[in-house]
C-alpha cells in the first residue's frame, strides 16, 4: 500500500511541502516538493557497487521541465520535449555544485539525480524547489552524504533583503542571488546584481544562509522519520607504506616541477615524473595498482602547492598572494567586426567580438515561466586547443553554457536600455588560451569589445577569480588564480563589476568552515584586483566609441499613426515585404506606431523613410494632388495619389462637358491633377479632375510626419 509521509513548513512568504513514499518506490529515494503550486519530483538512484577501474565520482544531475506543468503542449515538430535547453542545463549545474563536495572522498559509486518539474506557478521559480528536493532525496536515501543542504533566493528591493522573491518582485530587485549550504557553511553562490557594494553582497549571502536553516531542519526531521538505513560504506584505508615510497621518489621532484612558471612546460615535467615513478614502482612490484599510485601522486601535488602557499612562499608562477598576472589589452583587432578586443592575462586569453543587430535578431526564449525576448546575447566557446589538447568540436557543453551565463551576468548591469540603444547585441568570447578564470577574461573582453563597437555601456566592467587555501585556522586568499590553484585549492570565488560595485558573484566552496571573515577578505582583495584591471583596460579604451562601426546597421526611427500600421504592413505582409526588397533595409513596426528602419547605407534608409511617409500620409479634403491613372472603368477612372491611396474620379468629374467614353480622355499611367472632394466613412476617396483648377498649389505627395534618426 502507498504510505505517503509529508513534511510541511513555512519558508518566507511560501508554504513548502515535501512528500515521500508515494511515487517511484523502486528508486533509492524520491520526493515531491511543492512550493505554492510549483512542484518538482526528484529521485536519486545510487549504485551499490563501484564499476571496475572507476577513478572519479560519477555524479549526474538531470533537470527537466515538462510543458504540461504549465498547461501547454510543446511547440516542437514532434510535440514532445527534446534535449535540455540552456535554462535547464544551468539549473542542473546549480543543483550539482553544492552537492558534489559533500560526498566523501573516495566514494566512487555512480549516483544519478533526476529532477522533473511537474507543476509550475509562474511566480515561483522551480530552481530553488528542485535544489530542496535534491537535498531531501539524498538525506532520505542512505547514500554517504554530508548534508543536507538548504537553498534560498535573495532579492534586494528598497534597500531590504527579500527571501525567495516572486517573479514580479524580481523585476524590481537590484539583486538575484541564489545561495546554498549546510547548517554550518555556505557552499555555493550564484548571483547577478545591479552594481551593489561588497558589504551589500556579503550581507545577502549571510541573510540567505540564515534563512535556509528552516529547510535543513525540516529535511533532517523528514529523514529521521522516513529515511533509509545508511550504507555500510567506509573509505579504503591509505596504504601508508606505498604512500611513503611514492613520496620518497616524487615529492621533491614535484616540488621542483611546480617552480616552472610556464604551464605546458610544467605539465610536461609533472607528467614525466609521474610516468617515471609509476614505471619504477611497477617494475619493483607488479602487484601494485597504477590507479592507486596516480592517486597518491595527485595528493602529493596538492600537498606541495598548498603547503608553499600557507608558508607564504611565492605561488606556482612566482607571484605573491594578491598579485594579478601581466595584462595585455587590445581593441579593434578584427577589421570587419562591429567591435573586437583581445584580452590577455598571463596564460589566459580571450578574443571577444560584439555584433549589433536589429530587434528581429533578438532571441525569443520560450520558458516554462513564460515567453521572453533577450536583446543581449553572450556566447562563450572553449576549444580544446586553448589548453593544448585535441578534442571533439560541436554544440556547447554544460561548462561553456555556464561560463557564458556567468560572463553575461557580469556585463548585463551596464548594458543600455532598449529605448537608449535599440539594437540587439551579441557578444562572442573565443577562449584562445586558458590557465584559470577564462570566464572573467570574457567579462573584461566583452566590456572592451562593446566599447569598441560604440555600445553606450554605463561603465567598464572587469572580472577576477579568487582562490583559497585553508588548513585548520591558517588560510590564504589568492588573487587571479591559475588552473592548478583552482583545482588544488578550496574555493573558486569569481567577482565581476565596475569601479562602483559588483555586477556578478559566483562562489563554489569545496570545504566547510568558510567564515564571513574569509569571504570579506576575498571580496576586498577582489576589489583591489578589479580596480587594477580596469585601470589597465582604460589605457586601451576609456569610453565607448562616439559612433558605431561603418559595417553595423544604423537604426533610424520614425513615428506613424498606429491606425496606419496596417497600411505599411499590407495584406499578408505584402507591402512591408515589397518595401524591404525595394529599399534593401530591415523594417520593424511596434504596436505604438514606432517604426525602426535598419540599414548600413544612409541613402537606402532615407528611401525607406520616404516611402513609409508616403504610405502613411493623411489625405486632406479640398487639396489638389498629382496622381497617376491606375485603372479605367466604364463609370470613371481610379487615380493613385501617393501613399498607396487610390481614389475614384467619376466620369462626371473628368471634364466640364459630357464624357461618353473615359478612354477618350484618360490613359493608364497618365499623370493628372486631382482635387479631393470627399473621404467617406469607409475611407474611400472621391476625386475630381475638372475642379483641379489652375493657380492652386499642387501636392505631389501628401504631408507626412518628419523622421527622427
From Swiss-Prot:
Record protein name field: Polyribonucleotide nucleotidyltransferase
EC code: 2.7.7.8
Function, as annotated: Involved in mRNA degradation. Catalyzes the phosphorolysis of single-stranded polyribonucleotides processively in the 3'- to 5'-direction.
Residues in KH domain copies: 553-612
InterPro entries the UniProt entry points to: ExoRNase_PH_dom1, ExoRNase_PH_dom2, ExoRNase_PH_dom2_sf, KH_dom, KH_dom_type_1, KH_dom_type_1_sf, NA-bd_OB-fold, PNPase
Residues given in the record as Mg(2+) binding sites: 486, 492
Family: Belongs to the polyribonucleotide nucleotidyltransferase family.
Listed SMART domains: KH, S1
Catalyzed reaction equations: RNA(n+1) + phosphate = RNA(n) + a ribonucleoside 5'-diphosphate
Quaternary structure, from the entry: Component of the RNA degradosome, which is a multiprotein complex involved in RNA processing and mRNA degradation.
Gene Ontology cellular component terms for the protein in this record: cytosol
CDD domains linked: KH-I_PNPase (cd02393), RNase_PH_PNPase_1 (cd11363), RNase_PH_PNPase_2 (cd11364), S1_PNPase (cd04472)
Amino acid at each position: 500500500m502507498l504510505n505517503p509521509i509529508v513534511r510541511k513548513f513555512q519558508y518566507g512568504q511560501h508554504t513548502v511541502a515535501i512528500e515521500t513514499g508515494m511515487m517511484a518506490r523502486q528508486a533509492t529515494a524520491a520526493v515531491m516538493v511543492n512550493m505554492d503550486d510549483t512542484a518538482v519530483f526528484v529521485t536519486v538512484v545510487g549504485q551499490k557497487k563501484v564499476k571496475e577501474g572507476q577513478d572519479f565520482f560519477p555524479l549526474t544531475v538531470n533537470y527537466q521541465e515538462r510543458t504540461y506543468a504549465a498547461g501547454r503542449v510543446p511547440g516542437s515538430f514532434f510535440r514532445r520535449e527534446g534535449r535540455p535547453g540552456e535554462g535547464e542545463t544551468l539549473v542542473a549545474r546549480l543543483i550539482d555544485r553544492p552537492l558534489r563536495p559533500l560526498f566523501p572522498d573516495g566514494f566512487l559509486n555512480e549516483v544519478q539525480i533526476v529532477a522533473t518539474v511537474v507543476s509550475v506557478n509562474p511566480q515561483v521559480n522551480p530552481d530553488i524547489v528542485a535544489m530542496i528536493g535534491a537535498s531531501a532525496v539524498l538525506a532520505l536515501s542512505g547514500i554517504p552524504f554530508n548534508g543536507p543542504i538548504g537553498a534560498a533566493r535573495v532579492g534586494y528591493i528598497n534597500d531590504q533583503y527579500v527571501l525567495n522573491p516572486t517573479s514580479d518582485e524580481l523585476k524590481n530587485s537590484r539583486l538575484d542571488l541564489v545561495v546554498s549550504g549546510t547548517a554550518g557553511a555556505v557552499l555555493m553562490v550564484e548571483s547577478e546584481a545591479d552594481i551593489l557594494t561588497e558589504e551589500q553582497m556579503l550581507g545577502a549571502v549571510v541573510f540567505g544562509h540564515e534563512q535556509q536553516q528552516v529547510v535543513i531542519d525540516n529535511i533532517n526531521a523528514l529523514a529521521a522519520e522516513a529515511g533509509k538505513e545508511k550504507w555500510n560504506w567506509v573509505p579504503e584505508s591509505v596504504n601508508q607504506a606505498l604512500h611513503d615510497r611514492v613520496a620518497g621518489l616524487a615529492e621533491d621532484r614535484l616540488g621542483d616541477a611546480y617552480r616552472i612558471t610556464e604551464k605546458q612546460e610544467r605539465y610536461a615535467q609533472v607528467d614525466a615524473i609521474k610516468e617515471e615513478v609509476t614505471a619504477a614502482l611497477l617494475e619493483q612490484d607488479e602487484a601494485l595498482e597504477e590507479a592507486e599510485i596516480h592517486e597518491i601522486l595527485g595528493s602529493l601535488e596538492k600537498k606541495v602547492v598548498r603547503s608553499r602557499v600557507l608558508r607564504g612562499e611565492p605561488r606556482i608562477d612566482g607571484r605573491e598572494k594578491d598579485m594579478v598576472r601581466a595584462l595585455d589589452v587590445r581593441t579593434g583587432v578584427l577589421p570587419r567586426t562591429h567591435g573586437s578586443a583581445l584580452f590577455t592575462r598571463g596564460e589566459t586569453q580571450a578574443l571577444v567580438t560584439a555584433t549589433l543587430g536589429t530587434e528581429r535578431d533578438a532571441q525569443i526564449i520560450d520558458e516554462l515561466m513564460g515567453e521572453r525576448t533577450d536583446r543581449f546575447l553572450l556566447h562563450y566557446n572553449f576549444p580544446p586547443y586553448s589548453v593544448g589538447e585535441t578534442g571533439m568540436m560541436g554544440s556547447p557543453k554544460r561548462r561553456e553554457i555556464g561560463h557564458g551565463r556567468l560572463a553575461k551576468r557580469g556585463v548585463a548591469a551596464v548594458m543600455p536600455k532598449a529605448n537608449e540603444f535599440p539594437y540587439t547585441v551579441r557578444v562572442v568570447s573565443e577562449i584562445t588560451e586558458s590557465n584559470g578564470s577564462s570566464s572573467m577574461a570574457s567579462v573584461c573582453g566583452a566590456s572592451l569589445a562593446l566599447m569598441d563597437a560604440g555600445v553606450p555601456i554605463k561603465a567598464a566592467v572587469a572580472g577576477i577569480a579568487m582562490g583559497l587555501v585553508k588548513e585548520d585556522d591558517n588560510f590564504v586568499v589568492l588573487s587571479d588564480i591559475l588552473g592548478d590553484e583552482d583545482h588544488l585549492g578550496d574555493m573558486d570565488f569569481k567577482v565581476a563589476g565596475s569601479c562602483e560595485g559588483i555586477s556578478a558573484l559566483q562562489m563554489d566552496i569545496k570545504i566547510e568552515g568558510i567564515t564571513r571573515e574569509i569571504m570579506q577578505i576575498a571580496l576586498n582583495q577582489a576589489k583591489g584586483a578589479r580596480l587594477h584591471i580596469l585601470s589597465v583596460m582604460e589605457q586601451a579604451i576609456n569610453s565607448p566609441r562616439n559612433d558605431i562601426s561603418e559595417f553595423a546597421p544604423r537604426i533610424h526611427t520614425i513615428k506613424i499613426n498606429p491606425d496606419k500600421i496596417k497600411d505599411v504592413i499590407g495584406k499578408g505582409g505584402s507591402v512591408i515585404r515589397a518595401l524591404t526588397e525595394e529599399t534593401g533595409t530591415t523594417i520593424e513596426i511596434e504596436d505604438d506606431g514606432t517604426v525602426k528602419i535598419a540599414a548600413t547605407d544612409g541613402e537606402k534608409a532615407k528611401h525607406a523613410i520616404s516611402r513609409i511617409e508616403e504610405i502613411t500620409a493623411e489625405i486632406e479634403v479640398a487639396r489638389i494632388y498629382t496622381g497617376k491613372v491606375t485603372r479605367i472603368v466604364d463609370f470613371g477612372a481610379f487615380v493613385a495619389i501617393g501613399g498607396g491611396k487610390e481614389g475614384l474620379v467619376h466620369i462626371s468629374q473628368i471634364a466640364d462637358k459630357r464624357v461618353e467614353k473615359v478612354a477618350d480622355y484618360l490613359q493608364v499611367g497618365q499623370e493628372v491633377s486631382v482635387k479631393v472632394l470627399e473621404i467617406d466613412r469607409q475611407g474611400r476617396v472621391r476625386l475630381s479632375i475638372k475642379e483641379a483648377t489652375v493657380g492652386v498649389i499642387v501636392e505631389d505627395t501628401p504631408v507626412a510626419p518628419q523622421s527622427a534618426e
